Curated annotation (Swiss-Prot):
Cofactor: Mg(2+)
Originating species: Nocardioides sp. (strain ATCC BAA-499 / JS614)
Function: Catalyzes the reversible conversion of 2-phosphoglycerate (2-PG) into phosphoenolpyruvate (PEP). It is essential for the degradation of carbohydrates via glycolysis.
Protein name stated in the entry: Enolase
Pathway participation: Carbohydrate degradation; glycolysis; pyruvate from D-glyceraldehyde 3-phosphate: step 4/5
EC code(s) of this entry: 4.2.1.11
Origin superkingdom: Bacteria
Chain positions recorded as Mg(2+) binding sites: D241, E282, D309
Subcellular compartments: Cytoplasm; Secreted; Cell surface
CDD domains: enolase
Active site positions, chain numbering: E204, K334
Length: 425
């Protein structure tokens, strides 16, 4: 296999106009690849460290130090290594960093190199990335969990829940699922306009109107599904990312104008699940409310998918704690939360081995990089969260999945309703 000949990096902009890291890798057989790193708005306290420069430049958000770390520290250490030994490349970087949270070199530097090396190795092997990482069994196209209505940290509105998503569960193929989702998205815009509500967009391409309640958001989406000529619960299911850590303070949740305990939040979710075809709730409670998560999982885990994002931060140790303790039944997979491809794949493997579902995810600050689309197929996640069917940094991932589905031909299978406990039988 080809070895790594040169590694370069630069500062580029993400979809929010903030700097991020882009890495380029050249192998000695002239194979070449680049990768760009995403960045989150609502970040878990236990995520790997994203190195930012501070100071006045880019309001303190520059990544010149991370870029310098790639060029001056990481590159000399990995040049000459076999590009197909991903674990060795990643381990070399982790040892160079030497901290538990990648605080020295930065997860943004390490991840950029990790993904670019994988892409270059795939190029050298003359394989698409999903096949290179996932092998011959990588054939499952994910359900697109489309965030079409935004609140919380992703929007300037008075809606507590960060994301209201649609899941096109009734489609026979990914291509048809994408069409269904896009049609509901456009129908929602018309519904909002008709009601005199704002149609401005949040970070991830979803609409961000001011609404009276979180239930009102679900009702609007239900109306849009109907207006698109589709059936709620059959063609389209609903999902939410609550991001509850964002409104948790002093042991209670500041929610819908009052405060709620974990027990009251659980009762609230149970009522929603009984009223709407909700298949998945992400981060329903605070990232350190392990007892609350256990009670909520006991109550709702057999009915719906309960996803740990801030709870697990794609970290095998925190995920193992949840598996042992009975918290959640699914893992949200964000490559930049943990900061290397190897560690990401280890987390997915641990989840799958223990019967936890997985959802591949973007971040709110994205680029045109499509790596996560390939990784969703490579890992047979069956679900991907990469925003609304709008804004090119979101659509880039959907378009890559269309290409993968075409390339797989008859071998392609769309995950559909079987991805979720509510419909899996």
């Amino acid at each position: 296999m080809a070895s790594i000949e040169a590694v370069g990096a630069r500062e580029i902009l993400d979809s929010r106009g903030n700097p991020t890291v882009e890495v380029e890798v050249l192998l000695d057989d002239n194979s070449f690849a680049r990768a760009a790193v995403p960045s989150g708005a609502s970040t878990g306290a236990f995520e790997a460290v994203e190195l930012r420069d501070g100071g006045d430049r880019y309001l303190g958000k520059g990544v010149a130090k991370a870029v310098e770390g790639v060029i001056q520290t990481i590159a000399p250490a990995i040049e000459g290594l076999a590009a197909d030994d991903q674990r060795l490349v990643d381990q070399t970087m982790l040892e160079l960093d030497g901290t538990p949270n990648k605080g020295k070199l930065g997860a943004n530097a390490i991840l950029g190199v990790s993904l670019a090396v994988a892409r270059a190795a795939a190029d050298s092997a003359e394989l698409p990335l999903y096949r290179y990482v996932g092998g011959p069994n990588a054939h499952l196209l994910p359900v697109p969990m489309m965030n079409i209505l935004n609140g919380g940290s992703h929007a300037d509105s008075n809606v507590d829940v960060q994301e209201f998503m649609i899941a096109p569960i009734g489609a026979p193929t990914f291509r048809e699922a994408l069409r269904s989702g896009a049609e509901v998205y456009h129908a929602l815009k018309s519904v909002l306009k008709k009601k005199g509500l704002a149609t401005g967009l949040g970070d991830e391409g979803g609409f961000a109107p001011n609404l009276d309640s979180n239930r009102a958001a679900l009702d609007l989406i239900a109306e849009a599904v109907s207006a698109a000529g589709l059936t709620l619960g059959k063609d389209i299911a609903l999902a939410m990312d609550v991001a509850a850590s964002e409104f948790y303070k002093d042991g209670s949740y500041a929610f819908e104008g009052g405060t709620k305990t974990a027990e009251q939040m659980t009762a609230y979710y149970a009522d929603l699940v009984a009223s709407y075809p909700i298949v998945s709730i992400e981060d329903p409670l605070d990232e350190e409310d392990w007892a609350g998560w256990k009670a909520l999982t006991d109550e709702l885990g057999s009915k719906i998918q309960i996803v740990g994002d801030d709870l697990f931060v794609t970290n095998v140790e925190r995920l193992q704690r949840g598996i042992t303790g009975g918290q959640a039944n699914a893992l949200l997979v964000k490559v930049n939360q943990i900061g290397s491809l190897t560690e990401t794949l280890d987390s997915v493997e641990l989840a799958h081995r223990n019967g936890y579902r997985c959802m591949m995810s973007h971040r709110s600050g994205e680029t045109e990089d499509t790596t996560i689309a390939d990784l969703a197929v490579a890992t047979n996640c069956g679900q991907i969260k990469t925003g609304a069917p709008a804004r090119s940094e979101r659509v880039a991932k959907y378009n890559q999945l269309l290409r993968i589905e075409d390339e797989l031909g008859d071998a392609a299978r769309y995950s559909g309703a079987s991805a979720f406990p509510r419909y899996a039988g």
